[in-house]
Amino acid sequence: MARNTGWCIPLDKLKIREITLFAVLGAMTFAAKYAMAFLPNIEPVSLFVMLFAVAFGKKAVYPIYLYVLLELLFFGLGTWNIMYLYIWGILALAAYGCRGMENPLGWAILSGCFGLLFGAFCAPVDVAIGGVGYAVSKWISGIPFDITHCAGNFVIAFVLFRPMRQMLTKLNKQ
C-alpha cells in the first residue's frame, strides 16, 4: 500500500478504475453523439445519461459532465453549454427516480418525453437571453425538431436500454 507523503493522495485500484471508466464513458457519449450527427436531432446522449444515473447513482455526474466539458472544448461556448449544465441533470434525476423500473417501454417513454420537452427545458436560458417572446417563438419553431428528438429517443431507449443497463451494472460490480 502506498504511503501518504503529504503531497499526494494514494488511490486504490477501485478509485482508479472508476476514474478510468467514467472518462471512457464520457468520451464515448461525446463520440457516439457525433457519430450520429448526420441524423437530425437523433442522439444517444439521453440513453447514456439515463443509464449512468441508474448504474452509478450520484457518481453519474462524472461521465455526464465530462461529456458537457468535451462539448465546450470542441465547439466553444454557446447557449447550449449553459442549458446542458442543467438539462442532463434533469434527465439523470428522473432516471434515478425510476431506477427500479424494468420495463423497456417505460424507459422509452421517459426518454421520448424528455426529447419532446427538450425545447421547453431550454426556455429558461432563452428567456434570460432574449425575453419571453424570444423563448416562446424559439420553442414553437423547434417543435418539429423536438418531435424528431422524441421519436429517436424512444426507439433508441426501447431497443438499447435493457442490454446496456445489464452491461453497465456488470461493469460497476467488477
Mark where each language-model region is:
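Membrane-embedded alpha-helical hairpins and interfacial helices in multi-pass inner-membrane proteins
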Residues: 81-85, 103-174
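Short helix-perturbing small/polar motifs within transmembrane alpha-helices
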Residues: 2-9, 18-25, 67, 83-128
